[in-house]
């Protein structure tokens, strides 16, 4: 599962046809050291000169749907985000850092919590891969993000569209692959320090890194931290409950040898975000805050969450003749707690403990008559335990496996690839009886409705067992029509088993402002998606067009419940929602063009559009929930200095981020509402500072939402909080004007 980067070189070049940082496939310009270990090659040639023909993004080696291949040879749509791009982009979390990419959005809960969305699909439809294994941390929840520290990410691959072939259930929308930095060449030792500050919420972050390779023994140690007080905007002022604190530690230890490598990675991640409830004073309309509340405090306001994530991954790769055998074993422990009682601040309400064991074994066979084959098996075992005094989902056990085979062949200018996979998942949910609990409620297990008058001696959760299976695959081609013009076609089938929340949730908590009810009769989702892609590059223009059509059967979503008088059903004074399903069709695509008429000047434009329709439904339920609005991003970038004596890559960029009005929303019982359009003006600048020909530090400055525009993104969950009775505006608005500074200091030892 782990990407075979096979020697990626990250470097900065000032060229009219390229971005300031590119990942280059070393094999295209230097084959004399072909026996160098793949992990060392990227660094052992870091400072070697490249020819101009090498510096093309299409030469990046990516995972793809069928194994390692050049980006231009992958028929499926893939985006690559380099280390330099991540450095330059101010953000509050790793999903926020990549949400500017075409086709990628984020469901947000305030400024610090983001869930990834790819082409209108999110939650358990996006698989996140980190350290080679899929990240498992209660993805069904809205109110917490991805347990990955931004400082630990070196580059990102974004696979758009069904990727169940390699990653199994849940990869309906695509996959986010977060890569750590490659190990260094023998004899190298390096350190790195970075820090940053943002003015709106006082966000302060830092990262320390030390890596090396002595005689094949490799290590990479990183510690990072972050803290932020409440953010502010023009309408709400400081938003109580939006503060956060983050700490992360990672340690890689391993051995590189001629026949392969063995690496052990240990990760710890701790996040303490507040919970925005959005309650308002009816007379003033202002957000309610506790007495003596300091909006700029970095402390933990009540209520708040606490997330601990531990991970251990053993990554082995062995070269067997011309073949390659890979084995990954992983363990993850995720614990999420919610604290909400002022009287008992150490007593948590919800307390989830999730244990996950990951395994992945696959073999890449030697090339035979131009054909490349790989086969493998991967999956996971899970156990979830309820340790708190409140309950939302039952305790459960899960085991799944998937067996797959892939192939690819290059025939002149034509590249063919495809594969097939079988998945099986078994879920066993445990019963929970609550006695004398007036707050316990049950839903009909067949999803037919709500029974709010259950006896006090009742089951909160009924025990059940479900098994799901599916056959998926993909077939595609990439054809080089001209040296700088490529055509891509791909057809893929996706599969997703319902998650535990969709099947059997029965409860409410501070983070969602919803009482959610599951439905054990739900069927697995399956989809067919067709992709058409074209890209063109020249010294003056670079352009790309990617179109898709996706048909999903048994698409699962939640809808707001109403009584016979069309009034919202309330449980414990909280609106009730229940999961249901239907068939859906999603159409859309992304277009980008970068015009650079003169050296150092770039005029870029990207446009993303998604139209998500539920088939055979009336107008109020025609559109799927959480569909991102059409988005147009335009920027002008000028590089003033390239490879100067003191400054390098000195640039300024002006950006217009235009989100169009979203009139396509799921309107049943006011589950969603329309979202007005808005435009944000941003400005970015940066440079490398050199001393004696070497990079001393990198400095980045930015100003986002320069006009301090008050807006709500359509995917903001805070949009549906309390109504301001004074102004009539509903919910909490997104962050206002924000300036930031970031400094990165590399240290060669």
Identify the residue ranges that each predicted region occupies.
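Outer-membrane beta-barrel translocator/receptor signature
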Residues: 137-139, 152-154, 165-235, 242-249, ...
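C-terminal beta-signal and adjacent terminal beta-strands/loops
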Residues: 553-554, 558, 660-665, 687-749
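Transmembrane beta-barrel wall of Gram-negative outer-membrane proteins
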Residues: 201-227, 237-276, 304-321, 367-368, ...
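Structural signature of Gram-negative outer-membrane beta-barrels, strongest in the C-terminal barrel
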Residues: 368-372, 378-380, 388-552
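Short acidic/polar hinge/loop motifs at secondary-structure boundaries
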Residues: 133-160
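Flexible loop and strand-edge segments within Gram-negative outer membrane beta-barrel domains
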Residues: 228-230, 240-242, 246, 260-321, ...
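Outer membrane beta-barrel strand-and-loop segments of large Gram-negative receptors
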Residues: 347-362, 517-523, 529, 538, ...
């Amino acid at each position: 599962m782990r990407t075979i980067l096979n020697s990626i070189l990250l470097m900065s070049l000032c060229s009219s046809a390229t971005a300031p940082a590119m990942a280059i496939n070393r094999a295209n310009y230097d084959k004399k050291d072909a026996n160098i270990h793949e992990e060392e090659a990227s660094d052992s040639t870091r400072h070697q000169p490249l020819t101009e023909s090498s510096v093309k993004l299409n030469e990046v080696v990516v995972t793809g749907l069928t194994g390692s291949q050049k980006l231009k040879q992958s028929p499926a749509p893939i985006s690559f985000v380099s280390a330099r791009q991540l450095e330059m982009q101010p953000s509050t979390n790793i999903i926020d850092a990549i949400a500017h990419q075409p086709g990628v959005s984020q469901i947000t809960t305030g400024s610090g919590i983001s869930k990834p969305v790819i082409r209108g699909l999110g939650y358990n439809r996006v698989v996140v891969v980190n350290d080679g294994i899929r990240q498992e941390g209660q993805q069904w929840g809205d109110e917490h993000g991805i347990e990955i520290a931004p400082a630990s990410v070196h580059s990102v691959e974004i696979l758009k569209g069904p990727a169940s072939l390699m990653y199994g259930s849940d990869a309906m929308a695509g996959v986010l692959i977060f890569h750590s930095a490659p190990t260094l060449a023998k004899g190298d030792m390096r350190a790195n320090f970075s820090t940053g500050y943002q003015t709106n919420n006082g966000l302060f972050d830092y990262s320390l890194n030390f890596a090396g390779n002595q005689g094949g023994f490799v290590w990479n140690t990183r510690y990072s931290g972050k803290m932020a007080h409440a953010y502010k905007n023009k309408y709400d002022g400081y938003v109580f409950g939006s503060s956060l604190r983050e700490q992360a530690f990672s340690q890689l230890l391993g051995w590189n040898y001629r026949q392969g490598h063995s690496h052990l990675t240990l990760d710890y991640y701790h996040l303490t975000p507040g919970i925005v409830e959005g309650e308002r004073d009816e007379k003033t309309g202002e957000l309610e805050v506790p007495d003596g509340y300091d909006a700029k405090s970095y402390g933990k306001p009540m209520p708040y969450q606490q997330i601990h994530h531990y991970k251990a991954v053993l990554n082995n790769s062995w070269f067997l003749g011309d073949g390659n055998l890979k084995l990954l074993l992983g363990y993850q422990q995720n614990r999420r707690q919610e604290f909400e009682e002022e009287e008992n601040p150490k007593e948590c309400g919800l307390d989830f403990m999730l244990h996950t064991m990951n395994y992945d074994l696959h073999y890449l066979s030697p090339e035979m008559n131009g054909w490349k084959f790989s086969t493998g098996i991967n999956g996971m075992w899970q156990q979830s335990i309820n340790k708190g005094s409140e309950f939302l989902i039952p305790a459960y056990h899960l085991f799944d496996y998937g067996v797959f085979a892939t192939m690819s062949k290059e025939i002149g200018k034509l590249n063919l690839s495809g594969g097939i996979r079988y998945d099986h998942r078994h879920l066993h949910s445990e019963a929970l009886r609550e006695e004398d609990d007036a707050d316990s409620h049950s839903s009909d297990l067949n999803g037919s409705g709500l029974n709010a008058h259950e006896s006090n001696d009742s089951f909160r959760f009924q025990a059940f067992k479900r098994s799901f299976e599916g056959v998926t695959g993909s077939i595609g081609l990439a054809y080089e029509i001209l040296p700088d013009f490529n055509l891509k076609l791909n057809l893929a089938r996706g599969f997703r088993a319902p998650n535990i929340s969709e099947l059997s949730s029965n409860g409410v908590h501070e983070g969602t402002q919803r009482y959610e009810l599951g439905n054990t009769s739900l069927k697995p989702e399956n989809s067919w998606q067709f992709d058409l892609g074209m890209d063109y590059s020249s010294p003056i223009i670079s352009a790309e067009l990617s179109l898709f059509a996706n048909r999903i059967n048994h698409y699962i979503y939640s809808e707001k419940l109403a009584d016979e008088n069309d009034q919202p059903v309330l449980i414990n004074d909280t609106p009730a929602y229940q999961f249901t399903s239907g068939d859906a069709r999603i159409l859309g695509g992304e277009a980008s063009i970068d015009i650079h008429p003169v050296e150092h000047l770039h005029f870029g434009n990207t446009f993303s559009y998604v139209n998500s329709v539920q088939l055979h439904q009336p107008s109020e339920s025609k559109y799927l929930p959480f569909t991102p609005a059409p988005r147009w991003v335009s920027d002008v970038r000028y590089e003033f200095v390239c490879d100067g004596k003191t400054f390098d890559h000195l640039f300024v960029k002006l950006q217009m981020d235009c989100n169009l009005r979203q009139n396509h929303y799921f309107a049943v019982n006011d589950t969603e509402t329309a979202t007005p359009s808005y435009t944000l003006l941003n400005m970015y600048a940066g440079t490398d500072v050199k001393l004696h020909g070497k990079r001393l530090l990198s400095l980045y400055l930015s100003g986002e939402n320069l006009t301090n525009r008050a807006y709500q993104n359509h995917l903001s969950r805070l949009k549906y909080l309390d109504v301001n009775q004074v102004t009539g505006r509903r919910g909490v608005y997104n962050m206002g004007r924000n300036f930031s500074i970031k400094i990165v200091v590399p240290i060669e030892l």
